[in-house]
């Protein structure tokens, strides 16, 4: 009798475990099915975006902005190194422009992000940029930005405070001349702040260094360069976005 009871109890436990295992398997199957469905939807959305004209335009603008950022990084960094403003370790100086290999790709990526962000913010806040929207103005803005960077390496002042104030005035003048939007001013200040923090982190960890640092391991005028660079790249991104929008409407 006792053996029969033990047999019945073991059978009921086995059925309970089987039932519980079946529930777990069914739950896992549902979760996997939902995950696969979400992945399929995401891939379909990505494919449709890339296949659309807007997706192609986004990729083209990103590539153009990346190329511009790489080119400006090479040229401007060459100006700084020629004046011994920035110093890289000898083992790092390996390219034709005597620049660390990672600087141009990082600047290109940052230019692509900033250039795409400016028109996106304009559309989000409902403040389309309408001031001097032509390529001639953009090219003049680039020339002024290069001039500001060259001045930071070329001009000699009695102290760095005078140089920093002069470059700050020139940077604000660049924004006022070629932008004048609140979003451009806000993004320029944000970019200058974040880029300065990143630069301080790199210098602090010995990736490279500045000669005669006067502001937390770096030069005090560096935020002015980042601000004017953000405004310049933002104008390029806006002009590219306007051109792609007109082309889309024309099609």
Curated annotation (Swiss-Prot):
Keywords annotated in UniProt: Cholesterol metabolism, Endoplasmic reticulum, Lipid metabolism, Lipid-binding, Membrane, Steroid metabolism, Sterol metabolism, Transmembrane, Transmembrane helix
Residue stretches spanning the membrane: 59-81, 101-118, 134-156, 160-178, 184-205, 220-237
Motif KxHxx per record, residues: 245-251
InterPro entries registered for this protein in UniProt: INSIG_fam
Pfam families: INSIG (PF07281)
Residues at the site labelled Required for the recognition of 25-hydroxycholesterol: 145
Cysteine pairs bridged by disulfides in the record: none
One record GO biological process: cellular response to insulin stimulus
Compartments where located: Endoplasmic reticulum membrane
GO MF annotation list: oxysterol binding
Task performed by this protein: Oxysterol-binding protein that mediates feedback control of cholesterol synthesis by controlling both endoplasmic reticulum to Golgi transport of scap and degradation of hmgcr. Acts as a negative regulator of cholesterol biosynthesis by mediating the retention of the SCAP-SREBP complex in the endoplasmic reticulum, thereby blocking the processing of sterol regulatory element-binding proteins (SREBPs). Binds oxysterol, including 25-hydroxycholesterol, regulating interaction with scap and retention of the SCAP-SREBP complex in the endoplasmic reticulum.
Entry note about domains: The KxHxx motif mediates association with the coatomer complex. Binds oxysterols in a pocket within their transmembrane domains and interacts with SCAP via transmembrane domains 3 and 4.
Subunit structure: Interacts with scap; interaction is direct and only takes place in the presence of sterols; it prevents interaction between scap and the coat protein complex II (COPII). Associates with the SCAP-SREBP complex; association is mediated via its interaction with scap and only takes place in the presence of sterols.
Protein name, entry field: Insulin-induced gene 1 protein
């Amino acid at each position: 009798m006792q053996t029969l009871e033990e047999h019945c109890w073991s059978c009921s436990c086995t059925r309970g475990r089987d039932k519980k295992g079946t529930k777990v398997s069914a739950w896992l199957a549902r979760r996997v099915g939902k995950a696969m469905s979400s992945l399929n939807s995401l891939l379909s959305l990505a494919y449709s975006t890339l296949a659309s004209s807007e997706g192609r335009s986004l990729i083209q603008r990103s590539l153009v902005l990346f190329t511009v950022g790489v080119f400006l990084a090479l040229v401007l960094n060459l100006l700084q190194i020629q004046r011994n403003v920035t110093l890289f370790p000898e083992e790092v100086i390996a390219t034709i422009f005597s620049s660390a290999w990672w600087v141009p790709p990082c600047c290109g990526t940052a230019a692509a992000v900033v250039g795409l962000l400016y028109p996106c913010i304009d559309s989000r806040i409902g403040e389309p940029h309408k001031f001097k929207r032509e390529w001639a103005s953009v090219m003049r803005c680039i020339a002024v930005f290069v001039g500001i960077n060259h001045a930071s390496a070329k001009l000699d002042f009695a102290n760095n405070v005078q140089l920093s104030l002069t470059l700050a005035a020139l940077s604000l003048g660049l924004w006022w001349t070629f932008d004048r939007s609140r979003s451009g001013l806000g993004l320029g200040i944000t970019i200058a702040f974040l880029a300065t923090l990143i630069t301080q982190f790199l210098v602090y960890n010995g990736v490279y260094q500045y000669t005669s640092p006067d502001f937390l391991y770096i030069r005090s005028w560096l935020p002015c360069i980042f601000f004017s660079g953000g405004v310049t790249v933002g104008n390029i991104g806006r002009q590219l976005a306007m051109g792609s929008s007109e082309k889309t409407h024309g099609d």
